[in-house]
Each structure stands twice: as structure tokens, then as C-alpha cells.
Amino acid sequence: MTPKDFVTAYLPFAKIAEAKTGISAIAILAQGALESGWGSAVVGNSFFGVKSLPGALAADKQLITTTEYSRRQDLKFPVILSVTPVVRNGVKMFKYSVKDYFEKYDSAAECFEEHGNFFIQNARYKSALLVKSDPVKFLTAVAKAGYATDPNYAATLTKIVAMINKNI
């Protein structure tokens, strides 16, 4: 899916989520674009890469291959495919290729709605919610709070925000 197609298809859902939560629709689309590969890797309507909580019902989760970064070499996942030493932003880390459990949704609309609720219900994103109307500031704060393990997460999202703005 092209960035233009992604924006056309999912901006309505992002606008509904923005109206309910105040989180910028552009920020929502940027995160969805990155986490889903511009809609090319949407399994179980999971656009945002939200991991399932321990104890989640089997019907509400799915095992998906993903990449994680950590300074530790001893992390645990349901399935570890590989662990490779890497340097990211001048920091020695380990790149994990793993299978982990992620949320599953009945529809794209449900996923976009739950995306905003996720931030509101998790105290670690309190500072991000203070700047929720500014897509770059919000996404930078989300990255700083630990949403993703990739140290380049905020920079990548900032580039995607610019791409989305060109396609609205």
C-alpha cells in the first residue's frame, strides 16, 4: 500500500480516535504506518504493535514475528529465532528476532479506537498525553516512554509524519 493509499484508507479511523482522545490523527497514522509497514503487515487488524498482556485470552492475541532491541542478552520471549550483537546510535545492543504475542482486533476501527485508550490507560505515557495534539512531540514522548525498543523509533516516526502530511 502506498502512503497515499494508507492515508486515504485509515485517516477516517484516525480522525475518530482523535475526536475521542485528543491524540493527533497524524501521530496515530504515523505510528500505524510504521508498525504495520504502511498496511502491508496487518495481521488480526493489529496496526500498532501492541503486545498482549499476560493472561490474555487466546482469542484476543496472536503470535507474530518481530524485532526487539536490548542492551541485555538474556531476555525471554515465547520463541527466540536469533540474537545478534549490533551497534545502534553508538550503543552496543542485541537485536532479537522473536515471536511474541500481540493484540488482535475484530476490525481496523476497533484497533484505532483501542490505540488511544492504550495511552490513556498506561501511566507511563502521561507526559506524552500532555503534548498529544502535536504529532512529533507526542511520538517523541511515546518513544522516550518505551513504546518500542528500536532506538531510532522517534526519528523514524518524525520522517513518517512528514510523509503523511504530504499525502493528506
What does each model-found stretch correspond to?
Residues 1-168:
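Catalytic cores of secreted/periplasmic lytic hydrolases that degrade extracellular macromolecules
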